């Protein structure tokens, strides 16, 4: 895969480490789309890596329907020959986005990049459904959080009322003595 990419982009072997950004990589899977920004912010704040570039395929969706957030980073590792600065790609996406991307990647491989139009259209429709699914799951999460906050507020109110009753009871007992 790396050698194919080098041939396709006419990259000589001695330039591989500086010109191919995704030799190493990690994929971070989030439950909710809004978590992606949080994770990206945490990565940006790290002092042990430097951000080379960011690609926001959430706002700039690829024509295929691909959505994800990519950061290309520089990271220093210790080797037998001393410290070495490497490039790596960090992909951040939701579980639903990852499911779609995995299927799309398999189909691209199967069709060798020449996916039939009817399959590409179905993938595009599935990508739209993934967007709707991620939004719906975020909405459900918001409702659950609102319900939990409301429940906590009610619980605090009951505690306050019971404390007031207890204080009134103590005051009334002191007056009787």
Predicted segments with their positions:
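A glycine-rich, hydrophobic loop/mini-helix early in the fold
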Residues: 1-24
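Intrinsically disordered, low-complexity acidic/polar and Pro/Ser/Thr-rich regulatory regions
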Residues: 136-177
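Long beta-strand-rich cores associated with HINT superfamily self-processing modules
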Residues: 17, 29-139
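A structural signal for alpha-helix termini and helix-coil/disorder junctions
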Residues: 8, 12, 45, 49, ...
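Proteins with a high burden of low-complexity, intrinsically disordered sequence enriched in S/T/G/P/A and R
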Residues: 1, 106, 112, 167-176
